[in-house]
Regions:
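Membrane-interface capping segments at transmembrane-helix boundaries
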Residues: 20-24, 199, 325-340
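Extracellular/periplasmic helix-loop-helix junctions in multi-pass membrane proteins
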Residues: 298-316
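Cytosolic, membrane-interface loops and tails of multi-pass inner-membrane proteins
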Residues: 19-45, 251-283, 341-345
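Alpha-helical transmembrane segments of integral membrane proteins
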Residues: 277-295, 299, 303-304
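N-terminal hydrophobic signal/anchor transmembrane helix of membrane proteins
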Residues: 227-231, 313, 317-334
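"…together with the soluble PPM/PP2C metallo-phosphatase catalytic core" -> "…together
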Residues: 1-249
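A helix-boundary/kink motif common to multi-pass secondary transporters
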Residues: 93, 151, 280-281, 308
Length: 346
């Protein structure tokens, strides 16, 4: 009942706060202008992550004690909010943003949110030792950027994040965790309320303010939950729960390297672009990705309770199916054919 109460409270807060943020965004010129590479056909409020941040943070202390983990999440989350706001307003350079993400990760590590070990499938643990900090930084920054890159259509990042974090919630409950499931439902409720205004046609975008904050909290949830478990399959759980954004980002990097393009260069090869290319409208493409994410989340939940060798077979099979599907969609190509590139909502 406590988790349900937390979800409902953050949901209501998000529903109340988001319209206020929409008005403030227009007033303070936190808006996204229409453009050739943009999905919006009119000026749209951005920095919507502020609403998600407030809906998450306001009740946080009522449901969880102010221990080191929560302090780190509050301080680091606020830092990520500020970084996102600066980027949404001034479009700061990628290197500066990357350094900011590393600083955000180091804040969590300073307060004890770190990956100290990986469960050894053959028994015991593999302690990371001096590699704890770089491994944790890599994980946090990677999750931040995967959520950031999947934020390409109305409601896409928010919906995928809800599914991923609810998967981590279910797994954390299985493992009798305390902090991770509460963080998960607080974030899920915040995103769910925001989604009402972010789903197509969007009245507000989450911006980097939202995508970086959400990615940051999801990373914290995975570290304090699934990755703290003694189960041998723990590493597979967050990777499957976040498989859509993780694989989409991985494919983007591979696509750009093999085509001699800068890794940070935008293109039309992401999964949502490819779904639009085969004739789907925005809503259909987004819902299709939701369904894929939900299936992968269900698999992540199921394998958490089975033997490692069986889980490994399932995990590898899923990855191979994803790669096959990506190839069929043409995700490894660089650009979409012009005739299939319309972002019109038909």
């Amino acid at each position: 009942m406590l988790y349900l109460a937390a979800f409902i409270i953050t949901l209501i807060l998000s529903l109340i706060i988001t319209p206020v943020v929409i008005k403030l965004s227009h007033h303070l010129n936190f808006v996204d202008q229409p453009g050739v590479r943009k999905i919006n056909k009119k000026v749209t409020a951005t920095a919507g992550g502020t609403a998600i941040f407030l809906a998450f943070m306001i009740p946080l202390r009522f449901f969880l004690p102010a221990n080191q983990t929560i302090k780190g999440i509050m301080i680091g989350g606020t830092f990520m909010l500020i970084l996102g706001l600066l980027d949404d307003k001034f479009e700061i350079s990628a290197p500066i943003k990357f350094v900011g993400q590393i600083i955000g990760a180091l804040i969590l590590i300073y307060y004890g949110v770190k990956i100290n070990f990986i469960t050894n499938p053959f028994g015991g643990f593999i302690y990371l030792g001096i590699y704890t900090v770089p491994f944790t930084v890599f994980w946090i920054v990677s999750i931040i950027n995967t959520i950031n890159l999947i934020d390409g259509l109305d409601g896409l990042a928010a919906g995928v994040s809800i599914i991923a974090v609810l998967t981590l919630f279910a797994v954390a409950l299985q493992e009798n965790q305390v902090i991770a499931p509460m963080l998960a439902v607080l974030l899920a409720g915040s995103c769910f309320g925001f989604l009402k205004y972010n789903f197509n046609p969007a009245k507000i975008f989450m911006g980097d303010t939202g995508s970086m904050f959400i990615g940051y909290i999801i990373a914290a949830v995975s570290i304090t939950g699934a990755l703290k478990s003694a189960a041998a399959v723990t590493i597979f759980v967050p990777m499957l729960a976040l498989a859509v954004p993780i694989m989409d980002t991985t494919f983007a990097i591979i696509r750009r390297i093999f085509n001699d393009r800068p890794i940070g260069e935008a293109d039309h090869g992401h999964i949502h672009h490819r779904l639009l290319a085969i004739g789907m409208n925005q809503k259909q493409a987004v819902i299709s990705v939701y369904v894929i994410s939900a299936i992968l989340g269900t698999i992540a939940f199921v394998i958490n309770g089975i033997k490692f060798d069986h889980a490994l077979i399932i995990f590898v099979s899923v990855i191979l199916i994803i790669i096959y599907g990506a190839k069929r969609l043409g995700i490894f190509s660089v650009e979409l054919p012009q005739e299939g590139c319309s972002l019109e909502d038909s």
